[in-house]
Amino acid sequence: MSMPIASTTLAVNNLTNINGNANFNVQANKQLHHQAVDSPARSSMTATTAANSNSNSSRDDSTIVGLHYKIGKKIGEGSFGVLFEGTNMINGVPVAIKFEPRKTEAPQLRDEYKTYKILNGTPNIPYAYYFGQEGLHNILVIDLLGPSLEDLFDWCGRKFSVKTVVQVAVQMITLIEDLHAHDLIYRDIKPDNFLIGRPGQPDANNIHLIDFGMAKQYRDPKTKQHIPYREKKSLSGTARYMSINTHLGREQSRRDDMEALGHVFFYFLRGHLPWQGLKAPNNKQKYEKIGEKKRSTNVYDLAQGLPVQFGRYLEIVRSLSFEECPDYEGYRKLLLSVLDDLGETADGQYDWMKLNDGRGWDLNINKKPNLHGYGHPNPPNEKSRKHRNKQLQMQQLQMQQLQQQQQQQQYAQKTEADMRNSQYKPKLDPTSYEAYQHQTQQKYLQEQQKRQQQQKLQEQQLQEQQLQQQQQQQQQLRATGQPPSQPQAQTQSQQFGARYQPQQQPSAALRTPEQHPNDDNSSLAASHKGFFQKLGCC
């Protein structure tokens, strides 16, 4: 994770291999994002599709969201939500539908939708069609794209040619320039968030930018006033690629996006960065080690055996001041000069187009891609589990034991008829929306049961603590020779009024000292039991 990030990657399971060359000019396909805008006034094909969908009265409305978006198969899942392929039923355009639990601690889809609306119409940025709430989830509908650069990097043997890196780098710089032109900085540059288009489309090999959950305004859109410089900021982004200033806790600006791009370029060229694989007891110390390694690594040592222009690029962007505007065109010319030195041209030919004997990538042959960060083999929350304290582990162990006891009781109470009925329940396709709904309902039920169990465990612990405190008080009173205090039941009786009627006890004056310990303990236990019964938890 890297840091907490909500990556979303869009892909489709039935994508075929890429045909045709890419248009390297990132401005040439500006109208692509407008072809899919919702509009009832479409071609005759669109009208026919709409008529057919309206005439089908038996359609399954449970798989339709946002009025006319049909949910298909699940194509990705991660700690922040689930991704489905879908179809616009009005015009037949394929879309990606992102689901996010509404009760999540840090919802991001609404803010991401606002960012997409700001960027709508920008070349090679997915178009956002809809945001809304469906049951227990927020949903976001955007353009469906192809695999990420990280996926393609894997398929190509975890190393790109210099020519491919140059062409990819030029497009990535242009994407970030367009983002900066809209007064936004990205703050989470990584290969997972740069995708190519769908096969058969004019932009099939164009690089697209997705997932704006970490994006932030660096200046006021009206006054163009830049945000102030600050320090002691928390880390935002992916540690492998973030800038040195970000490691130092400094406010991010345009320069940090450009430096992170440079780290990605070297990642593609080398296949590995010097600060990868560092070990540390926890994430905080690991990020510190990564930052120290970045500072101690000379850019030209990093570029050893590679075109010197890449080292020069990283040196330039690291020297930018906080508010300085990057020279995007100068960076593109610098990197394109690498192709001149090699006698190559930016002809839109990429390494992934040579896969499978020149047929291009194919999901039926290549492994399933890392779908916009969903389904990542090492999600951030998995790493943090290794560093939990002993107290939390003990609580979890107690919870597990309590759950096992309840499961055993439920299993024992299950009748033979229930067992027979469960065997004949139809199995759902795990990639279907119905399966996801069922899974979500089960998850919320489990969370509710877990909260109830935690509450019960806390009440039991509280009761034990109160008993221990009462016993300690009684022991102290007996040690000093003072008579024990009145039973707790009398105080609680006064608190709860006439509804609470504890068993009457003889007065302390009529009891012998030998009677006090037993009487006090029994009355305390009874009083606490009655107290929790009134709360409805025993």
Curated annotation (Swiss-Prot):
This is Casein kinase I homolog 1. Residues 41-57, 391-410, 474-498 have a biased composition (Low complexity). Casein kinases are operationally defined by their preferential utilization of acidic proteins such as caseins as substrates. It catalyses: L-seryl-[protein] + ATP = O-phospho-L-seryl-[protein] + ADP + H(+); L-threonyl-[protein] + ATP = O-phospho-L-threonyl-[protein] + ADP + H(+). The keyword Nucleotide-binding applies. Residues 69-353 form the Protein kinase domain. The lineage of its organism: Eukaryota, Fungi, Dikarya, Ascomycota, Saccharomycotina. Keywords: ATP-binding, Cell membrane, Kinase, Lipoprotein, Membrane, Mitochondrion, Nucleotide-binding, Palmitate, Phosphoprotein, Serine/threonine-protein kinase, Transferase. Its main location: membrane.
